[in-house]
């Protein structure tokens, strides 16, 4: 019996040793993996890292398997002999277990010391692999830099920082190294740069487009940036354009004697518009549109200091002067610009001027729309062209309009030309009217006397034909089309019509006691049928060139232009309208697209791109959508908007489902924000002068 008890005690001791050994092995495996995790260092050599990580894992798995088998054998022995155990045997077992645990603890400490030593050796090996991989990556990057002639700043410091990571702290796994020809690849501890205000040259953009033709930047603003470089070199032609020869003027803008940048050349700008990917996103536009500041409940003072006056273009009818079925000019049904901006707390107005009148007549009407009073076209002008001197009477939105009290002017299409001419009259007057007044006496409108500076803060043009349009030369100003336009005016001038198309100064309004037959006979004798004092002529290349010669830049005004393009190059090299272009502009788009001069072909359906960028004889600079457009005395040319035709700027194409109201809201919000920056810049300048 004593022998049996001794055997059972021996079995129990063996079982205790096994249990403790299993626990020790488990602790060893956990400790080994923790040490391994803490010693991982970022490396660009994925193969070496994988090989290093697999070694301790395999050792741990082998140890665990061996200890599990030993534990299982001891467990089987315990099941056979453990049924007859006594309390005394249990006490002996506990004492033996304590003694054995002490011995096992010493063994574990010895094993851990050995493991730490092995891990240190592996760490040195991994560090060597990392240095070799890093050096190899640097040599590859140097080759890429030599190939693409691009500067990479900070790559050495980044590599050094990666090698000097504190080994006492767990490191973040290294990212896969991708060669970047524009800038150094960011490390895992530094987030990639998201700076969109840094300009790129056209050459860099073309290279990016070639490498990733289908890649789109979803973080870009609503308008596609064609020319994203801010050019500090002002472009000014020394020669004024010859009438009917604008192409020579544009080709000669950048003379070899002047410092120029191909990024600001009109031909290059249009070429970039062809190659640049379309990244306009209506989703992004909808998100940006939500940034519009709502009108506060107790707000009385508008958000903008100076009123914003929107001026429509050719064929435009607004407010009470628009027929029942005529679309809302500013925004259509997609986004009612005037109404929505007023809800946001902005002081905005839509001017109502002649839909068919000349820029001269429209400029005079615009002045009286703002100031108020009866329209005075001028005695000299009326005598020269043969229409009435006085027109309708405006109530005025700003009767106290005078120097120091300014307005912002935003013009679509022909409206941009009208704005420029009115500002010229305010500042420099009308020489013909001044001379006529001196010779004949009588009254003269304050508009024509000049000396009224500092009454306009900014001029913004949207798809304006500053240099004219071939569509007017070859279609709009033809005799047949003019007869149709004037016949429409004659019909709408009957006594029962409340619609004013803007030619009442020419007699296109039936008198109360006049029969319709007599009215037709009278109007048929009007000089308008053969006159150039109308919109059809002013939109031609010659008419626009004359306007450019009449106007100048005001150093106190911020000038900005927006341009769209909705055509593509066909197999024969001519421009064809894009799918989705407003159907009424298909013919005019093809007329422009088949011009003999290649740089004049790209268009928005009505206006060639080269004409909308800026007046050909005035200085300009290309700006991005990200930078504040607050410069004065120079045309700031915004990037060409891909896929926008002439009426997309005002949202009246009800058949175009690609252009959403949120996109239009974002566009006009951007304009308003620029105008607020102009006011802030002006206020800051005033404070600096006062101090």
Curated annotation (Swiss-Prot):
User: Its catalytic activity?
Assistant: a triacylglycerol + H2O = a diacylglycerol + a fatty acid + H(+)
Ranges of Polar residues composition bias in the record: 41-72, 94-115, 125-135, 142-172, 186-196
Q: Which GO terms describe its cellular component?
A: extracellular region
What's the main place this protein lives?
Answer: secreted
Which GO annotations describe the biological process of this protein?
lipid catabolic process
Tell me which positions the record assigns to the signal sequence: 1-37
Name the propeptide positions.
Answer: 38-296
Q: Which UniProt keywords apply?
A: Calcium, Hydrolase, Lipid degradation, Lipid metabolism, Metal-binding, Secreted, Signal, Zymogen
What's the domain of life for this entry? Bacteria
User: EC number(s) per UniProt?
Assistant: 3.1.1.3
Residue numbers annotated as active site: 413, 604, 646
Recorded hits in InterPro entries, A to Z, give: AB_hydrolase_fold, Lip-like_C, YSIRK_signal_dom
Here the segments flagged for biased composition (Basic and acidic residues) are: 73-82, 197-214, 258-267
**Which compartment or compartments is the protein found in?**
Secreted
Q: Which GO molecular function entries does the Swiss-Prot or TrEMBL record give?
A: metal ion binding; triacylglycerol lipase activity
State the similarity comment.
Belongs to the AB hydrolase superfamily. Lipase family.
UniProt protein name: Lipase 2
Organism of origin is Staphylococcus aureus (strain MRSA252)
Q: Its gene?
A: lip2
């Amino acid at each position: 019996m004593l022998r049996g008890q001794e055997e059972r005690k021996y079995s129990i001791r063996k079982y205790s040793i096994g249990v403790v050994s299993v626990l020790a092995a488990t602790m060893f495996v956990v400790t080994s993996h923790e040490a391994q995790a803490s010693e991982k260092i970022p490396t660009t050599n994925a193969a070496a890292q994988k090989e290093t990580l697999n070694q301790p894992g395999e050792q741990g798995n082998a140890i665990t398997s061996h200890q599990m088998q030993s534990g299982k054998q001891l467990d089987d022995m315990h099941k056979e002999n453990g049924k007859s155990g006594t309390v005394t045997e249990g006490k002996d077992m506990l004492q033996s277990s304590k003694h054995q645990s002490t011995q096992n603890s010493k063994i574990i400490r010895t094993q851990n010391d050995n493991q730490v030593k092995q891990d240190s050796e592996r760490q040195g090996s991994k560090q060597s692999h990392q240095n070799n991989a890093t050096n190899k990556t640097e040599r590859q990057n140097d080759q890429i830099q030599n190939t693409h002639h691009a500067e990479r700043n900070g790559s050495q410091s980044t590599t050094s920082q990666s090698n000097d990571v504190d080994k006492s702290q767990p490191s973040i796994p290294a990212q896969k190294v991708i060669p970047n020809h524009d800038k150094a690849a960011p490390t895992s501890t530094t987030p990639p740069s998201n700076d969109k205000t840094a300009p790129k040259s056209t050459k860099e953009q073309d290279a990016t487009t070639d490498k990733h033709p289908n890649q789109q930047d979803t973080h870009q603003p609503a308008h596609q940036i064609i020319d994203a470089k801010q050019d500090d070199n002002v472009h000014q032609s020394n020669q004024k354009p010859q009438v009917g020869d604008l192409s020579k003027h544009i080709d000669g803008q950048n003379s070899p004697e002047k410092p120029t940048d191909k990024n600001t050349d009109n031909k290059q700008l249009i070429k970039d518009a062809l190659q640049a990917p379309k990244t306009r996103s209506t989703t992004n536009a909808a998100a940006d549109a939500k940034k519009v500041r709502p009108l506060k409940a107790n707000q009385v003072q508008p958000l903008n200091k100076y009123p914003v006056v929107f001026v429509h273009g050719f064929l435009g009818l607004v407010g009470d002067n628009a027929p029942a079925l005529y679309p809302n000019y500013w925004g259509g049904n997609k986004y009612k610009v005037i109404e929505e901006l007023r809800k946001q707390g902005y002081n905005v107005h839509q001017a109502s001027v002649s839909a068919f009148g000349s820029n001269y007549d429209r400029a005079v009407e615009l002045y009286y729309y703002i100031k108020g009073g009866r329209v005075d076209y001028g005695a000299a002008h009326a005598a020269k062209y043969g229409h009435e001197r006085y027109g309708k009477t405006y109530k005025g939105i700003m009767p106290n309009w005078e120097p120091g009290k300014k307005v912002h002017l935003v013009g679509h299409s022909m409206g941009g030309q009208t704005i420029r001419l009115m500002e010229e009259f305010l500042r420099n007057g009308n020489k013909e009217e001044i001379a006529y007044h001196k010779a004949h006496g009588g009254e003269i409108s304050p508009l024509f006397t000049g000396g009224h500076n500092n009454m306009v803060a900014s001029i913004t043009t949207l798809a304006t034909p500053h240099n004219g349009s071939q569509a007017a030369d070859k279609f709009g100003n033809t005799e047949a089309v003019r007869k149709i336009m004037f016949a429409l005016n004659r019909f709408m001038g009957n006594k029962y019509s409340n619609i004013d198309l803007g030619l009442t100064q020419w007699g296109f309004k039936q008198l109360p006691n006049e029969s319709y037959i007599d009215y037709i006979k009278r109007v048929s004798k009007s000089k308008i049928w053969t006159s150039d004092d109308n919109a059809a002529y002013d939109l031609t290349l010659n008419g626009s060139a004359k306007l450019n010669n009449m106007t100048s830049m005001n150093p106190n005004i911020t000038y900005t232009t927006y341009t769209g393009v909705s055509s593509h190059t066909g197999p024969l090299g001519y421009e064809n309208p894009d799918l989705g272009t407003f159907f009424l502009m298909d013919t005019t788009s093809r007329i422009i697209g088949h011009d003999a001069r290649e740089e004049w072909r790209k268009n928005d359906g009505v206006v060639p791109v080269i004409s909308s960028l800026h007046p050909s004889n005035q200085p300009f600079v290309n700006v991005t959508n990200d930078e504040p457009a607050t410069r004065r005395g120079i045309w700031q040319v915004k990037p060409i908007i891909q896929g926008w035709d002439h009426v997309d700027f005002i949202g009246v194409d009800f058949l175009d489902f690609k252009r959403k109201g949120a996109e239009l809201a974002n566009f006009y919000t951007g304009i308003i924000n620029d105008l607020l920056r102009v006011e802030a810049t002006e206020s800051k300048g005033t404070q600096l002068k006062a101090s």
